[in-house]
A protein has these predicted regions:
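Short loop/turn motifs that connect adjacent beta-strands in outer-membrane beta-barrel proteins
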Residues: 22-31, 68, 128-136, 188-196, ...
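Sec-dependent signal peptide recognition
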Residues: 2-10
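Short glycine/proline- and aromatic-enriched beta-strand/turn motifs that initiate or cap beta-hairpins
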Residues: 21-72, 78, 237, 241, ...
């Protein structure tokens, strides 16, 4: 048996032992939960002046109490190709309309919005059915660290004006604190691995510009005012609830 097969078999056994255990849904249970999710978000506030729609991939890890309160950590990585900033590299364009590399040849310069946040959350589950009191309407509040910037790529080209630390003069790095609210539905399967959550979220980023100069606007002071970066979007995720296995009964003659 090759190494991959052994790892797959071990993971399958681990998953089956914990998440396939049959648990009655008539009563809430306490259990750890790990999940992965995808989401999309529309930018608002100051963020909308720089970027448009974001895709988001994330992880969550937490603990659900018998009271149906929950707490934990969640993190999202943001990625997009929707840039609303214009003219960033206009001063590097030659008379032929090209940005040239170190060999004097036309170069391709690409920019991509990127971001990340890491939050601590607290949530409350409001059950809708007596048959499964571990599923229902989920409300979460969270807060933590947020960062967003422009990723600048020149691929196989070397463009001296935007290499290494010079990129910092164009990347619009902003960091700060964020708050987030989530409203959706959470389904914990009592008898299997098909457990999911889905809903809407609203995020407010209270960030600051972290660069002291923008090379494309050297005569314009970088604002030191607090930014309000807003996002409104959806999230769909799958998670593994780590139910404890039911004790087995043994009979002896």
């Amino acid at each position: 048996m090759n190494r991959f097969a052994r790892i797959f078999l071990l993971g399958s056994c681990f998953h089956c032992h914990f998440s396939h255990a049959q648990v009655s849904g008539s009563e809430p249970v306490a259990l750890p939960v790990v999940g992965i999710h995808y989401g999309g978000a529309f930018s608002g506030g100051d963020l909308a002046a720089r970027y448009g729609y974001f895709n988001r991939l994330g992880l969550t890890a937490g603990y659900k109490l018998k009271s149906n309160w929950s707490f934990g950590l969640e993190s999202d990585f943001w990625f997009s190709d929707n840039v609303r900033l214009t003219g960033i590299f206009d001063h590097l364009v030659d008379d032929a309309g090209n940005i040239t590399n170190d060999l004097g040849m036309p170069a391709s310069v690409l920019v991509y919005p990127r971001g990340v946040h890491v939050n601590a959350y607290i949530g409350k589950l409001f059950t809708l059915s007596k048959n499964n009191q571990n599923s229902g309407i989920l409300v979460q509040l969270s807060g933590g660290y947020l960062l967003h910037r422009l990723r600048i790529e020149t691929n196989d080209n070397v463009v001296p004006q935007i290499e290494l630390d010079y990129k910092k003069g164009y990347d619009r790095l902003s960091t700060g604190f964020n708050t987030q609210q989530f409203l959706g539905y959470s389904f914990l399967n009592n008898r299997g691995s098909v457990s999911f959550y889905a809903g809407l979220y609203f995020q407010q980023g209270f960030t600051y510009n972290r660069r002291t100069i923008n090379f494309d606007q050297p005569d314009i002071p970088v604002s030191t005012a607090r930014r309000l970066d807003l996002q409104t979007g959806f999230r769909v995720g799958w998670y593994i609830p780590f139910y404890s296995a039911e004790p087995r009964e043994y009979y002896y003659n």
